[in-house]
UniProtKB/Swiss-Prot annotation:
<keyword id="KW-0694">RNA-binding</keyword>
<dbReference type="GO" id="GO:0000049">
    <property type="term" value="F:tRNA binding"/>
</dbReference>
<feature type="region of interest" description="Interaction with tRNA">
    <location>
        <begin position="148"/>
        <end position="150"/>
    </location>
</feature>
<dbReference type="InterPro" id="IPR046884">
    <property type="entry name" value="MnmA-like_central"/>
</dbReference>
<keyword id="KW-0547">Nucleotide-binding</keyword>
<dbReference type="GO" id="GO:0103016">
    <property type="term" value="F:tRNA-uridine 2-sulfurtransferase activity"/>
</dbReference>
<feature type="active site" description="Nucleophile">
    <location>
        <position position="102"/>
    </location>
</feature>
<feature type="site" description="Interaction with tRNA">
    <location>
        <position position="334"/>
    </location>
</feature>
<keyword id="KW-0963">Cytoplasm</keyword>
<feature type="active site" description="Cysteine persulfide intermediate">
    <location>
        <position position="197"/>
    </location>
</feature>
<dbReference type="Pfam" id="PF20259">
    <property type="entry name" value="tRNA_Me_trans_M"/>
</dbReference>
<protein>
    <recommendedName>
        <fullName>tRNA-specific 2-thiouridylase MnmA</fullName>
        <ecNumber>2.8.1.13</ecNumber>
    </recommendedName>
</protein>
<keyword id="KW-0819">tRNA processing</keyword>
<keyword id="KW-0820">tRNA-binding</keyword>
<dbReference type="GO" id="GO:0002143">
    <property type="term" value="P:tRNA wobble position uridine thiolation"/>
</dbReference>
<comment type="similarity">
    <text>Belongs to the MnmA/TRMU family.</text>
</comment>
<keyword id="KW-0067">ATP-binding</keyword>
């Protein structure tokens, strides 16, 4: 049992994971309070009340657990750091991962500062990831449940943040969490969280259309030949095949998008493989990038199969990742996260891929 004088604030959405997180901490003897995030400002059209539904559901769970529940307004920083960047990235023909920025700036970054107002000792979330401390520092590890592991979305968190965080589900499996919630009759939603919480209906086109114009442009092949016309860069992503409107005997995929020229380049499936990736905003969590990359792997998307890392080298403000075997459709704007066994070593944002890097 823990020291009951330690206050742990649990980021609660009313879902299974955060609700069981609060319950487990109570069982461990912590003084627990729930906190939900107000992320939608009154002048924002997105969400259709989705954020309010989450807050109300979290309040019901907190009442069932007999713990205090608070709401903190982080709508300004969410709008500035997450939504504005999301739109800007899409306008440049990139495919961002807003969850990574949200964790760093909002759900964990800003919330860690806010809970100081409540004199809280720790912030706990329902992420499936682990935190381990030893003589070499504090480390971020994969969650035990490989199918639910969320360490990919947390790779930017600094060690000083990890030291004030708890991930009680890190050693758990999703099926067991659902069973616990059912047995305790917690008033939770069994639905999985939305990929992008501020677009709960998944209609990216409508969301982006309220914030930017779509300018049609040319679709080219790799020789520069015009094959057709696209409807606007934000509507496409590297690796996309559907919706191109091209008549071709060959299956063609988006291989590159040039925001300056407002063009999309398409190529055959095999031409999207690359074993060299250029990364920006590179972060290395451990002490020094070793010359020996034996055992290191990288994920170039959350659901991507891992690829073996051959070499990591610096090129000005960027880093070049060389892989032992090629990956398909390394997408600008997505994160490439590097692991050694279960430990998150670092990562960066994909700028481009190809042998000419």
């Amino acid at each position: 049992m823990s020291d009951s004088s330690e206050l742990v604030m649990v980021a609660m959405s009313g879902g299974v994971d955060s609700s069981v997180t609060a319950m487990l901490l109570l069982e461990q003897g912590y003084n627990v309070a729930g906190v939900s995030l107000q992320l939608k400002s009154n002048n924002e059209p997105y969400g259709n009340g989705y954020n309010l539904k989450l807050i109300n559901r979290a309040r019901e769970v907190a009442a069932a657990l007999n713990i205090p529940h608070y709401v903190v307004d982080l709508s300004d920083i969410f709008s500035q750091r997450v939504i504005a960047d999301f739109c800007q990235q899409y306008s440049q023909g990139r495919t961002p991962n807003p969850c990574i920025r949200c964790n760093y700036y909002v759900k964990i970054g800003a919330l860690l500062n806010k809970i100081q107002d409540f004199k809280a000792d720790y912030l706990a979330t329902g992420h499936y990831a682990r935190i381990v401390s030893d003589e070499n520092g504090t480390h971020l590890l994969r969650g035990a449940d490989g199918k639910k592991d969320q360490s990919y979305f947390l790779y930017t968190l600094p060690p000083e943040s990890l030291s004030r965080l708890m991930f009680p589900l890190g050693q758990k499996y999703k099926k067991d969490i659902v069973r616990l919630a059912t047995n305790m009759k917690l008033p939770v939603s069994q639905k999985e969280s939305q990929d992008v919480c501020f677009i709960p209906d998944g209609d990216y086109k409508s969301f982006l259309a309220t914030r930017m114009g779509f300018t049609p442009g040319k679709i080219l092949d790799t020789t520069g030949k015009i094959l057709g016309e696209h409807q606007g860069l934000p509507l496409y992503t590297v690796g996309q095949r559907q919706g191109l409107g091209l008549a071709s005997n060959e299956k063609l995929f988006v291989s590159d998008m040039n925001a300056d020229a407002n063009t999309i380049t398409v190529a055959g499936h095999d031409q999207l493989y690359t074993s060299r990736i250029l990364l920006s905003n590179f972060i290395w969590r451990e002490s020094g990038i070793p010359l020996d990359t034996s055992g290191m792997i990288v994920k170039v998307r959350y659901k991507a199969a891992p690829a073996e890392v051959k070499k990591i080298s610096q090129s000005g403000d960027f880093y070049i990742l060389e892989l032992a075997s090629p990956v398909w459709a390394a997408t600008p704007g997505q994160a490439a996260v590097i692991y050694l066994d279960d430990m998150v070593l670092g990562g960066g944002i994909i700028e481009s891929g190809g042998d000419t890097i």
